[in-house]
């Protein structure tokens, strides 16, 4: 057994020398070999120790050797790594420090969460983004994380991400308002400031979808206005009421839901405005169902056509897709597949020079289970190739989109 460990130690030493090579190809070969090794505890601790060293600069930030050494070890972690990364943290470069924080925020261990908060305290003012691992998907240890992490909202760059974490912990009923402690008044002030920013903002172009600064503001504001529902304060309630006049239906929806949590009913016309908006219709309905308040949802939008349209639009607004709500969208056909339904739409976007040239384009939403109709739940085939509508017959558009997706999912299942 000792001989095996000795060989692995020698191999790590040899690879370490290659990691210091001026040749990127040699370095990449060495890091790949390390990635493929089955590191034991001692070998992992040794690799973590090596991460303290300086290596030749990488072409791209993601190629940083020190950070990748941390990632290699923490991909298959041992509890012993927690105290080790704590001890070497101050000697690491900024990229490697981020990798350490990501590890501690991902490892489902109480000691790791304590170390995460401790190390975050050292560098939070220097962060541009908050490394929070899988805490959104798997929120845990609220008694460790809060209220301590709220101090770090002093760094405006990461404040909205910390509030997003807090929002998730509220949503999972892991915290209540008492956990805010001395930070409650600051959170209230931050919400009020965000309301002022939104209400006073002047969009710099014909459509806010072309205003990157506003899109960043709207993304952050959604977190604040959603969080506001858990902060019972008259000043917050008044600020939420102000937002009922905002033109952005996404922000208006968050404000309306939060007002309901405060015990105030939004006006009927405001509810109709929100439900009439394709981007947020399904979010709004699902939120009301979760709250047990679906009775206020307008019947005119409680049907499968409207839910399918919203599902299509929600897919289209992704930055990697259309990146905006289409100016027009029309249902062209419904295709049945046993108990499932697919909705074929055409849409166009005249407010964008790039998309205007494409004219009407085809997209499919669904499939939706007819047995649960009307439902907002699509089964994963919502998609568009952004092909011109006139380039194919409706049936051909449907087969082109759904056929390709079915092949993709089948190949994925076979791998």
Where are these regions (language model features)?
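Long, helix-rich interaction regions
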Residues: 1-17, 22-29, 47-99, 103, ...
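N-terminal, post-signal-peptide region of Sec/Tat-exported proteins
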Residues: 39-49
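Amphipathic, non-membrane alpha-helical rod segments
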Residues: 33-37
């Amino acid at each position: 057994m000792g001989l095996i460990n000795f060989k692995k130690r020698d191999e790590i030493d040899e690879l370490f020398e290659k990691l210091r090579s001026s040749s990127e190809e040699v370095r990449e070969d060495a890091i790949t070999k390390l990635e493929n090794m089955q590191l034991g505890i001692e070998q992992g601790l040794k690799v973590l120790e090596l991460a303290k060293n300086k290596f030749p600069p990488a072409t791209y930030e993601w190629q940083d050797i020190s950070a990748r050494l941390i990632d290699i070890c923490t991909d298959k972690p041992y509890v012993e790594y927690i105290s080790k990364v704590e001890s070497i943290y101050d000697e690491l470069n900024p990229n490697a420090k981020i990798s350490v924080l990501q590890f501690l925020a991902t490892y489902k261990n109480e000691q790791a969460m304590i170390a995460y908060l401790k190390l975050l305290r050292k560098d939070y003012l220097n962060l541009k983004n908050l490394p929070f691992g899988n805490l959104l998907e798997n929120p845990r240890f609220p008694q460790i994380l809060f209220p301590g992490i709220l101090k770090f909202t002093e760094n405006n760059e990461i404040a909205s991400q910390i509030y997003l974490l807090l929002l998730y912990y509220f949503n999972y009923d892991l915290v209540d308002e008492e956990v805010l402690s001395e930070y409650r008044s600051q959170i209230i002030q931050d919400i009020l400031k965000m309301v002022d920013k939104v209400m006073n903002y002047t969009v710099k172009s014909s459509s806010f979808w072309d205003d990157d600064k506003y899109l960043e503001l709207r993304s952050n504001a959604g977190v604040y206005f959603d969080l506001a529902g858990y902060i019972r304060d008259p000043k917050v309630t008044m600020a939420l009421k102000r937002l009922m006049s905002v033109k952005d239906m996404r922000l208006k929806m968050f404000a309306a839901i939060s007002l309901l949590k405060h015990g105030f009913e939004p006006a009927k016309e405001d509810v109709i405005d929100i439900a009439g908006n394709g981007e947020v219709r399904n979010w709004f309905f699902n939120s009301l169902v979760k709250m047990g308040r679906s009775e206020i949802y307008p019947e005119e939008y409680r049907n499968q056509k409207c839910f399918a349209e919203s599902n299509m639009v929600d897919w289209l607004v992704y930055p990697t897709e259309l990146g905006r709500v289409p100016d027009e969208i029309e249902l062209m056909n419904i295709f049945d597949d046993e108990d499932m339904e697919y909705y074929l739409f055409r849409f166009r976007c005249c407010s964008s020079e790039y998309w205007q040239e494409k004219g009407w384009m085809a997209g499919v939403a669904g499939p939706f289970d007819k047995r649960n109709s009307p439902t907002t739940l699509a089964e994963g085939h919502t998609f568009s190739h952004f092909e011109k509508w006139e380039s194919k017959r409706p049936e051909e558009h449907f087969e082109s989109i759904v056929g390709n997706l079915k092949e993709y999912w089948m190949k994925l299942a076979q791998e």
